[in-house]
Amino acid sequence: MDWVAVIVSIIPFVGVLLAVGFYTLLERKILAIIMIRKGPSKVSYMGILQPFSDAGKLLCKEFIVPTRANVGPFILAPALMLAISLLGWLLYPYKSAEVFYVFGVILFMVITSVSVYGVMMSGWASNSKYSLLGAVRAMAQSISYEIPMGFIFFCVVLCSGVFMFQEISVFQQSLFFFFLPLCVVMLVWMLCMLAETNRAPFDFVEGESELVSGYNVEYSGGGFAVMFIAEYSSILLSSVMSAAMFFGGNEALVGFFMMVFAIFFVVVRASLPRLRYDKLMNLCWTVLLCVMLTASVCVVVLVGV
């Protein structure tokens, strides 16, 4: 076995885990600034090691399985969520990657579609009313936003002519950012990504004021830590894919706009309240779907001309 190849293939995942830790610190700092308070500042210099302290604390705590829970699925759900979120990073469009998926766009759609299964499994296996309601919301929400998201990919693929995220990014280097002709599509994409990652104002799956903590209310210790890492890994993945699809070009541009989108998620969380659940359903089925159908027709006509 070529151990060098194994180590090289593991490095990106280690980088993702480190990025998640520092992203949580960045989020807490930005939220503190917006709320006019200090934020984490005690652990190491300016609190820079706070995420690792929190992770160590969670992993050292006992992982409690509720008496009425279904033990197998309850333990498997966090691992499934983390595996699915890390699998998406294989599609990350960097030039030094050894594997490029020819149908990366389709694979990304599959990954985002099956990501809800981990939430569904945890909610059902917990045997808690709050967890089950969170899982049911996640399933209905997933069906609602994935249809407009499919039309978004259709528009981007039609403009670039390829299904690889790497090629979509490179295509924009020679012409222009897809953000310019597809600004409406990008707006719908950002709404879909907020719903996909269960972030405010679409954080119905957790809904602290309604469901205590939603699907993960019964999790503690390492199980909760793994779920937390999976959630924030998905946020960073959504940021980098957004940058590659609409602000592609060289790696520096993709990295810069990835940070912009990542900060956007935090600012939206601090700025907007949670909507009513029926408002999201109405938005997806009556507004976003109609907008994307119209946009798809316009893109087909313009590309054909």
From Swiss-Prot:
Transmembrane spans: 3-23, 71-91, 99-119, 145-165, 175-195, 221-241, 246-266, 285-305
Spell out the PROSITE patterns in the cross-references. Answer: COMPLEX1_ND1_2
InterPro entries assigned to the protein according to its UniProt record, in alphabetical order? NADH_UbQ_OxRdtase_su1/FPO (IPR001694), NADH_UbQ_OxRdtase_su1_CS (IPR018086)
Which Gene Ontology terms cover its molecular function?
NADH dehydrogenase (ubiquinone) activity
- UniProt-annotated location(s): Mitochondrion inner membrane
Q: Which EC number(s) are documented for this chain?
A: 7.1.1.2
What span is annotated as the signal peptide, if there is one?
none
> What reaction does this enzyme carry out catalytically?
a ubiquinone + NADH + 5 H(+)(in) = a ubiquinol + NAD(+) + 4 H(+)(out)
One GO cellular component this record assigns the protein to is: mitochondrial inner membrane
Its principal location? mitochondrion
Biological process according to GO: aerobic respiration
Bilayer topology reads:
Multi-pass membrane protein
Assigned keywords, A-Z: Electron transport, Membrane, Mitochondrion, Mitochondrion inner membrane, NAD, Respiratory chain, Translocase, Transmembrane, Transmembrane helix, Transport, Ubiquinone
Q: What does this protein do?
A: Core subunit of the mitochondrial membrane respiratory chain NADH dehydrogenase (Complex I) that is believed to belong to the minimal assembly required for catalysis. Complex I functions in the transfer of electrons from NADH to the respiratory chain. The immediate electron acceptor for the enzyme is believed to be ubiquinone.
Q: What protein family is recorded? A: Belongs to the complex I subunit 1 family.
Q: Which PANTHER family does the entry link to?
A: NADH DEHYDROGENASE SUBUNIT 1 (PTHR11432), NADH-UBIQUINONE OXIDOREDUCTASE CHAIN 1 (PTHR11432:SF3)
The name of this protein is NADH-ubiquinone oxidoreductase chain 1
